[in-house]
Swiss-Prot record:
Protein's name according to its UniProt entry: Trehalose synthase
Temperature optimum or stability note: Not thermostable. Approximately 25% of maximum activity remains after 1 hour incubation at 55 degrees Celsius.
Transmembrane listed as a keyword: no
Keyword Signal annotated: no
UniProt keyword list: Carbohydrate metabolism, Glucose metabolism, Glycosyltransferase, Magnesium, Transferase
Gene that this polypeptide is encoded by: treT
GO function terms (MF aspect): trehalose synthase activity
């Protein structure tokens, strides 16, 4: 089967654009670290250009790297729907679903698609190769490795289904560095000297995070029939069993018993590499029924980055009730907009939210209900927490910090 491997190049980000956000000293530090790497080629490979945090990061990171003299490129592998069904199974298994079984047919399809894609991208010609997530991880098997290869894992790998992990591990171990969001995601069999801990980031200048005028926010709310005069609870996430969407609906219903006017916004993108998302999307609609105070807002009806931005800014409370979460970029986005987030105490969320200071960490839906009611009844506390949340993002989770960490890794590999 022939695949059309696509190369993506978007935006014209420049490091200087971020000076007002990160300060001149930080800009100079990054420029200094980039000096030895100027003219070097650095290629990223993943499985989708749209939907999900990896694609969002790359849309900003690739042009930003180019602005400091690094020849950054980004390729997206292709495959049939069956391949993405298999890799979604991988995703679920690696995040801890023990009921899933790895068949010989799944292995064969996974390897065949990686092999076919390897014929259309000459990755051996780059100075540094960075492969994102399990989908293209086996690419390393099909090249003569002439330069450092890095594997970036964006999922919660703290307790994987062992059968799937053992299969994937044989490829991961061939990489020169493996990058994880948190130390607990590094499996014990891996060489700790090769492991790097690095949280992902957001781009404050992207359509999803840039400042919006209040008039634009109100126009967007009106377009999607959201009442700005009534309290708004929002969760932004894929339609995925791991995102805890049914818990969010339950939280909203219990809050509504106390505050009848409350509205719930379920905001999400239907991503191209997530066939399972369509099934869960339909289940979500059935769960909601005919409650017109719940809005399901997706790219299918014209919700794109700027609209998501407006919904987050208009919200009184942001939830992230994921059951597993490698690192919740939507949590960081909301925090950057000065919103305290109520999140389940799992994965990267535990690291993002400082409990009681920049938001609340909860164990279950009942705890979340208490915290939602508290924030709705104490807007001054909410505002204070939101200000601290924004500052935490500025110091730790901005795209320029992300890029700086990559520069450190490349320099350590002999840049």
């Amino acid at each position: 089967m022939m695949y059309e491997v696509k190369e993506f190049s978007s935006g014209k980000r420049k490091l200087e654009d971020y000076k007002s956000i990160i300060g001149e000293e930080e800009v100079s530090k990054i420029q200094e670290k980039a000096e030895k790497l100027k003219g070097r080629s650095f290629v990223h490979v993943n499985s989708t250009s749209f939907g999900g945090g990896v694609a969002e990061i790359l849309h900003s990171l690739v042009p930003l790297l180019r602005s400091i003299g690094i020849e950054a490129r980004w390729f997206v592998i292709e495959g049939p729907t069956e391949f993405f069904n298999v890799t979604k199974t991988f995703h679920n298994a690696l995040q801890g679903n023990e009921s899933l079984k790895l068949t010989e047919e799944m292995k064969e399809l996974y390897l065949n698609v990686n092999r076919e894609n390897s014929k259309f991208i000459d990755l051996s010609s780059f100075d540094y190769v960075l492969v994102h997530d399990p989908q293209p991880a086996a690419l390393i098997e099909f090249y003569e490795k002439k330069s450092p290869w890095l594997w970036r894992c964006h999922i919660d790998l703290s307790s994987p289904n062992r059968e799937f992990w053992e299969f994937l591990r044989r490829f991961v171990e061939k990489y020169d560095r493996y990058i994880f969001h948190l130390p607990e995601y590094v499996q014990p069999e891996l060489d700790r000297n090769k492991a790097v801990i690095m949280p992902p980031s957001i781009d404050p200048l992207s359509e999803k995070n840039v400042e919006l005028k209040q008039t634009e926010i109100l126009r967007i709310l009106e377009r999607f029939d959201v009442d700005p005069e009534k309290p708004i609870i929002t969760q932004v996430s894929r339609f995925d069993p791991w995102k805890g969407i049914f818990d969010v609906i339950e939280i909203y219903r219990k809050v509504k018993e106390k505050i009848p006017g409350v509205q719930l916004l379920l905001v999400g993108v239907m991503a191209h590499d997530d066939p399972e998302g369509w099934i869960y999307f339909e289940k979500t609609l059935r769960k909601i029924g005919e409650d017109y105070d719940v809005k399901v807002l997706t790219n299918l009806i014209g919700v794109h980055a700027r609209e998501v931005n407006a919904f987050q800014r208009a919200s009184d409370v942001i939830l992230q009730m994921s059951i597993r979460e490698g690192f919740g970029l939507t949590v960081t986005e909301a925090m950057w907009k000065g919103k305290p987030v109520i999140g389940r105490a799992v994965g990267g969320i535990k690291f993002q939210i400082v409990d009681g200071e920049t938001g609340f960490l909860v164990r279950d839906a009942n705890e979340a209900v208490e915290k939602v009611l508290y924030l709705l009844k104490h807007p001054e506390v909410s505002k204070e927490m939101g200000a601290k949340a924004k500052e935490r993002v500025r110091k730790n989770f901005i795209i320029t910090k992300h890029m700086e960490r990559y520069l450190d890794i490349l320099n350590s590999l002999g840049g």
